[in-house]
């Protein structure tokens, strides 16, 4: 993948029953380098069961944490706050957790390189409740402007906005979505690239939760308690 030199775009995560987190879209950060390492998912079972996509092991966390020179407990703290107690990145096989944001879609649909819609887009089968609601909104938007819809959605266990696809080391938002839909291991890799390329990694290394949460979750992080929640989560996993 080609290198990226760009400013961190705004990251917004709407409050959800799954992630239990929200943030504002007014944070910025500086790109300090480009991370290209990608862990492939060649060892997952061939069957299309949920276990094919979920189930990060301690070894998975350890491999990425070692490369980033950051504590495993620090990474897990972010997962807990962004993905909730279940710490999962998928609602069903091949169906990642998403949060569609209409304001972000309206902003980014005009910026999409490919503004075509996918008239054949379908809502994944078997979803209910909040998952069905979010995927229905995303699918309806995809029928109008597929790339814009993907850019205006927050993806996976780390709730990374699709508009940040380049900062995750992807050439296109389509590639970003494909990787997000492959496994939690790929979601972890995308997160690692994201925090490296946006300059957030030093804050996570130092466990400077205020600085990290301000960049990751926006200026209202303190009012929403992101920094204290991450600190408490870190303490939990550090035991």
How should these model regions be labeled?
Residues 1-55:
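N-terminal secretory targeting signals
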Residues 23, 42-239:
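Catalytic glycan-binding domains that act on GlcNAc-containing polysaccharides
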